[in-house]
């Protein structure tokens, strides 16, 4: 509507309902000429308050926000407390138990590399293959939160949330490291943890080569 016609917007990928995004990338083909850096302001003037365009650029020929993506990074945020904190609850999930970062890290190591994540996606998912590559998982502390960063070439529906749930169950003694290894080998849903709530998950980065924002400079 901002440009007097309907434009199709293509995103880097679909996020689960309730999941946040601070680094989502989209592209659209416009029927008019407008400097790339000015597009963000033009769009923000028409968007609701809970959506904002942080920056914009003119993409290079052939760029596609979805197909050109090389890797994505998600962050899942937890806070460990016996009591609910309303200031944290919108973007993090509360865990009523002590935090065992060592156990979380040991479980995370098992996911790194190329694996079949059939046990970690929703049943009935329509995908050609459930094999995915995880480049790395790291843990970081900030302002009462424990952030789990997961970087990979692509993800299945609910995959990151179920991975985090599995890591958490291991830290709570509900699953062994062998259970997690077996879940990747055998695809057995009974060997993984629960799917964590959507509110704790944020898409923080999508990487391209070349980077369309750098190419427009």
Language-model features, listed with the residues they occupy:
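Structured-RNA-binding interfaces characteristic of tRNA pseudouridine synthases
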Residues: 1-217
């Amino acid at each position: 509507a901002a440009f007097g016609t309907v434009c199709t917007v293509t995103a880097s990928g679909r996020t689960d309902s309730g999941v946040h995004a601070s680094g989502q990338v989209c592209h659209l083909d416009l029927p008019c000429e407008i400097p790339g850096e000015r597009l963000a302001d033009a769009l923000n003037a028409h968007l609701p308050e809970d959506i904002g365009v942080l920056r914009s650029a003119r993409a290079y020929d052939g760029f596609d926000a979805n197909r050109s993506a090389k890797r994505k990074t998600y962050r899942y945020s937890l806070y460990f407390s016996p009591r609910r904190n309303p200031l944290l609850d919108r973007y993090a999930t509360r865990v009523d138990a002590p935090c065992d970062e060592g156990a979380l890290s040991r479980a995370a190591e098992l996911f790194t590399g190329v694996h079949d994540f059939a046990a970690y996606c929703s049943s009935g998912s329509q995908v050609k293959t459930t094999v995915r590559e995880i480049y790395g998982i790291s843990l970081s502390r900030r302002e009462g939160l424990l952030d789990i960063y997961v970087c990979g070439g692509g993800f299945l529906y609910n995959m990151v949330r179920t991975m985090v749930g599995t890591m958490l169950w291991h830290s709570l003694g509900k699953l062994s490291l062998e259970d997690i290894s077996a879940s990747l080998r055998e695809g057995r849903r009974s060997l993984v943890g629960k799917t964590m709530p959507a509110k704790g998950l944020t898409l923080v980065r999508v990487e391209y080569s070349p980077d369309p924002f750098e190419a427009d400079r």
